[in-house]
């Protein structure tokens, strides 16, 4: 018998990658959960949080998502957080702010449909914009429904740079510093010193009023009317700003009731 001829086994050819560029990994920028987005809007970012996940489930997903998105910016930018009907307390807002800070982002404004979240955010010093409730969440009632008819009550001082937007009246127990602003569809009541901007009746309500213990606002607005407080300011005492045919008038609180009664008489 003749020995079987052996066939040499071909070795696989391995091409050298020396000097060639490595193929980069594809970055995952798709949200890990539905409804979690981070969008650039004119020098700011808008972070949208879904409302259908518990915080304990959303929190780790949010952290991973921020890691996958941090290539999108190269400087510290303000962030508006739109959390819809999600209820966030102060500790959760602080967690969120710290997570954003780790990625060179700064939490600046909370956009929410929950009054409790708005109060927590304002107490921590963030600007607040309260949204109207979706129609399905508004309880049916006789006549036109008012989605956010309840006033927003805040027991805090509004520092410079803070903005409060609300679709009803706003009550502040504390001062409103210069550089802060309140925009309300209803009345504005400041149980303290008003030095910032106050815009009552922002949706056209000329019957709205601005009331404060000390009127030293940089700007007053009622509906589309505009006024400034006297310079130099008068001695501090409670005053009321209200709209008339001649524009915005300011009256001492102890006489305003009498003035209002006369103007409202038939």
Curated annotation (Swiss-Prot):
* Pfam families, per database record: MinC_C
Biased composition, class Low complexity, residue ranges: 1-21
Role this protein plays: Cell division inhibitor that blocks the formation of polar Z ring septums. Rapidly oscillates between the poles of the cell to destabilize FtsZ filaments that have formed before they mature into polar Z rings. Prevents FtsZ polymerization.
**Complex and partners:** Interacts with MinD and FtsZ.
**Record bears the keyword Cell division:** yes
Record SUPFAM superfamilies: Cell-division inhibitor MinC, C-terminal domain
Query: What are the UniProt keywords, alphabetically?
Result: Cell cycle, Cell division, Septation
InterPro entries referenced in this protein's UniProt entry, alphabetically: CAP/MinC_C (IPR016098), MinC (IPR013033), MinC_C_sf (IPR036145), Septum_form_inhib_MinC_C (IPR005526)
**PANTHER family noted in UniProt:** SEPTUM SITE-DETERMINING PROTEIN MINC
Instruction: Give the domain of life.
Output: Bacteria
Q: What is the protein's species of origin? A: Thermosynechococcus vestitus (strain NIES-2133 / IAM M-273 / BP-1)
What is the protein name for this chain? Probable septum site-determining protein MinC
């Amino acid at each position: 018998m003749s020995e079987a001829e052996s066939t040499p086994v071909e070795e696989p050819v391995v091409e050298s990658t020396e000097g060639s560029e490595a193929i980069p990994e594809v970055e995952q920028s798709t949200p890990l959960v539905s409804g979690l987005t981070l969008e650039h809007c004119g020098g700011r970012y808008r972070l949208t949080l879904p409302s259908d996940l518990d915080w304990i489930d959303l929190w780790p997903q949010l952290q991973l998502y921020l890691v996958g998105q941090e290539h999108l910016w190269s400087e510290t930018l303000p962030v508006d957080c739109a959390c819809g009907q999600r209820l966030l307390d102060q500790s959760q807002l602080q967690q969120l702010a710290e997570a954003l800070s780790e990625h060179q982002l700064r939490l600046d404004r909370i956009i929410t449909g929950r009054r409790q979240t708005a109060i927590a955010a304002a107490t921590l010093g963030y600007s607040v914009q309260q949204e109207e409730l979706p129609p399905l969440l508004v309880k049916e009632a006789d006549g036109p429904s008012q989605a956010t008819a309840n006033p927003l009550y805040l027991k805090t001082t509004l520092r410079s740079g803070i903005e409060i937007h609300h679709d009803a009246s706003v009550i502040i127990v504390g001062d409103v510093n210069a550089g802060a602003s309140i925009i309300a569809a209803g009345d504005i009541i400041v149980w303290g010193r008003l030095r910032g901007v106050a815009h009552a009746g922002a949706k056209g309500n000329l019957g709205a009023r601005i009331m404060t213990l000390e009127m030293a606002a940089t700007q007053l607005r009622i509906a589309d009317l505009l006024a400034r407080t006297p310079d130099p300011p008068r001695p501090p005492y409670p005053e009321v700003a209200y709209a008339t045919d001649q524009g915005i008038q300011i009256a001492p609180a102890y006489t305003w009731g009498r003035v209002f009664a006369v103007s409202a008489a038939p």
